[in-house]
Amino acid sequence: MPCPCGSGCKCASQATKGSCNCGSDCKCGGDKKSACGCSK
């Protein structure tokens, strides 16, 4: 299931419901978390 944080966003961990925490878990390759569409 795609990460709801944003396009191309990958999560370090996912909840059992398939959603991810768009905080510290949000990673977008070598880009900053903001690039994933996470909350500022």
Curated annotation (Swiss-Prot):
It comes from the Eukaryota. Transmembrane segments: none annotated. Keywords: Cadmium, Copper, Metal-binding, Zinc. Pfam families: Metallothio_5. InterPro entries: Metalthion_5 (IPR000966). GO terms for biological process: cellular detoxification of metal ion; response to metal ion. Induction: Strongly induced by cadmium, copper and mercury. GO terms for molecular function: metal ion binding. All cysteine residues are arranged in C-X-C groups. These are thought to be the metal-binding sites in other metallothioneins. Belongs to the metallothionein superfamily. Type 5 family. This protein binds cations of several transition elements. It is thought to be involved in detoxification processes. This is Metallothionein-1. It comes from Drosophila simulans. The gene is MtnA.
